[in-house]
Regions:
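Cap/lid segment of the alpha/beta-hydrolase catalytic domain
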Residues: 1-27, 70-77
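Extended catalytic-interface subdomain
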Residues: 13-20, 38-41, 63, 84-91
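Alpha-helix termination/capping residues and helix-transition junctions
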Residues: 28-30, 55
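Alpha/beta-hydrolase fold nucleophile elbow
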Residues: 30-42
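Secondary-structure boundary/capping signal
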Residues: 33, 59-60
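Glycine-rich nucleophile elbow surrounding the catalytic serine of serine-hydrolase chemistry
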Residues: 40-52
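Conserved hydrolase catalytic core segment
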Residues: 53-59
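Mobile cap/lid helix-loop segments that gate and shape the active-site cleft of serine hydrolases
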Residues: 60-91
Length: 91
């Protein structure tokens, strides 16, 4: 884990579940270990990104429309307490 003392939201829990799914996949002899890829849409895209950056076994992440706090390049135009989305990511 990268941030062992941090509080986590739903995306972190889902990313943890993805890590366990990768464990299960890698126990199958027909799975190519260096070819694991993730995709997700909206909140699923954010969670796929988080899972991919916290597990080196995931080779490719392809988020779709992951929005604010996800893969989009954006500037914080309004004053907020946190630059991350308030409904799923780090807060």
């Amino acid at each position: 884990m990268v941030f062992t003392d941090a509080a986590f939201g739903a995306c972190s829990a889902w990313a943890w579940a993805v890590h366990r799914a990768v464990d299960a996949l890698l126990s199958q002899p027909e799975v190519q270990a260096d070819g694991i890829a993730l995709t997700g849409h909206s909140r699923g895209g954010k969670c796929a990104l988080l899972a991919g950056v916290t597990d080196e076994r995931i080779a490719v992440v392809n988020p779709n429309n992951s929005g604010v706090g996800g893969a989009s390049l954006n500037r914080l135009k309004q004053v907020r307490k946190t630059p991350f989305c308030s409904h799923c990511c780090f807060y």
